[in-house]
């Protein structure tokens, strides 16, 4: 579905085989994340030996897609779990590590796969369960990027890079760490509703902490609220006197042609926010088309055990401020 969606022309790689040449869905997702990481490192003009550490995660138990996928690269590894907010978690920790001087280059990556997510959290694919209209479709995709201590120079890179454009580059200039927000939702098939309160909290705190209004951002982009979650987010922010409708977009709504592709409320999964960020958003920031963006990946915190025991589904959302910085090198000179 992703390769036929609205963003198909922006992806670096589209694989027609959902198994990625592997024998299991889990191995397929590991291979996909490894490919994304390899692409990101190569586009930065680096090798795995140049990467000080990697922050990566996924939706599977014990984050096996990430650990198995990154293992062959030989990079010091931190495994993360933030559900579908994992890309925001990895970018936050990567930015902190770089700014603290713990590494010149940090790799951030995540992935999701429709089949592995269904197997992990819902029903076997052969069961053919009917999905409610509030449900989202897990994106089969992966995204990775390299955070550097120094501005990337497009003059020195062997080819184009989403982080180094002739007009400038994308930089992380601030973060708002998400809180676990429990609104008492129990419907795991309405994850947009579960995550919207967390997105509201993070966006509201970001605007307060940085003394900004929604208009100070060219776009506020949430991870995977979908149509249902977007409406709930607007209502919750309206109660706080904030209207972001003119600048809001959602990665879950950008990933598919919802009606034509029958994805109901939209897309979801770790790979949803990650693939939209790396394929579509970062190049637009690097080129200067977008000057300042608040990127807010959202996650629904649950497991098979917590759901079966009747626990509510909490949400979390991490805010990442991404800004366009003019290129440090003009006219082909560093």
Per-range role (PLM):
Residues 1-55, 59-65, 190, 198-215, ...:
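Conserved active-site "lid/cap" helical segment
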Residues 63-64, 114-119, 180-184, 229, ...:
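Short, well-ordered, mixed-charge alpha-helical segments that flank or form enzyme active sites
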Residues 1-26, 124-205, 209, 242-264, ...:
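Condensing-enzyme catalytic core mediating Claisen C-C bond formation in acyl metabolism
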Residues 68-136:
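A generic, well-ordered mixed alpha/beta core segment in the N-terminal half of proteins
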Residues 56-57, 106-112, 147, 293-298:
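Short beta-strand segments
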Residues 34, 81-108, 147, 268-289:
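Active-site-proximal alpha-helical scaffold in enzymes
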């Amino acid at each position: 579905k992703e390769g036929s969606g609205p963003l198909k022309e922006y992806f670096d790689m589209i694989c027609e085989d959902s198994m990625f040449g592997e024998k299991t869905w889990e191995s397929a997702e590991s291979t996909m994340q490894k490919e994304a990481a390899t692409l990101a490192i190569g586009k930065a003009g680096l090798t795995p030996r140049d990467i000080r550490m990697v922050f990566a995660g996924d939706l599977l138990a014990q984050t096996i897609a990430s650990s198995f996928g990154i293992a062959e690269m030989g990079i010091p590894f931190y495994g993360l779990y933030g559900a579908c907010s994992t890309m925001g978690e990895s970018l936050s920790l990567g930015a902190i590590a770089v700014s603290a001087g713990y590494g010149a280059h940090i790799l951030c990556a995540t992935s999701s796969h429709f089949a592995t997510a269904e197997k992990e959290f819902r029903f076997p694919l052969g069961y053919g369960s009917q999905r409610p209209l509030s449900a989202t479709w897990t994106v089969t995709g992966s995204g990775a990027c390299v955070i550097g201590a120094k501005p990337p120079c497009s003059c020195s890179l062997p080819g184009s890079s989403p982080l180094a454009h002739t007009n400038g580059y994308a930089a992380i200039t601030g973060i708002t760490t998400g809180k676990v927000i429990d609104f008492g939702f129990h419907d795991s098939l309405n994850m947009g509703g579960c995550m919207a309160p967390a997105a509201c909290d993070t966006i509201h705190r970001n605007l307060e902490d940085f003394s900004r209004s929604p208009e100070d951002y060219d776009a506020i982009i949430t991870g995977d609220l979908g149509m249902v979650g977007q409406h709930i987010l607007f209502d919750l922010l309206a109660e706080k006197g904030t209207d972001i409708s003119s600048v809001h977009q959602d990665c879950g709504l950008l990933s598919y042609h919802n009606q034509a592709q029958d994805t109901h409320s939209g897309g979801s999964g770790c790979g949803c926010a990650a693939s939209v960020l790396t394929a579509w958003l970062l190049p637009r920031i690097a080129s200067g088309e977008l000057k300042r963006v608040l990127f807010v990946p959202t996650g629904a915190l649950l497991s098979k055990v917590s759901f079966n025991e009747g626990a509510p589904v909490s949400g979390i959302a991490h805010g990442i401020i991404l800004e366009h910085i003019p290129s440090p090198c003009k006219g082909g000179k560093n």
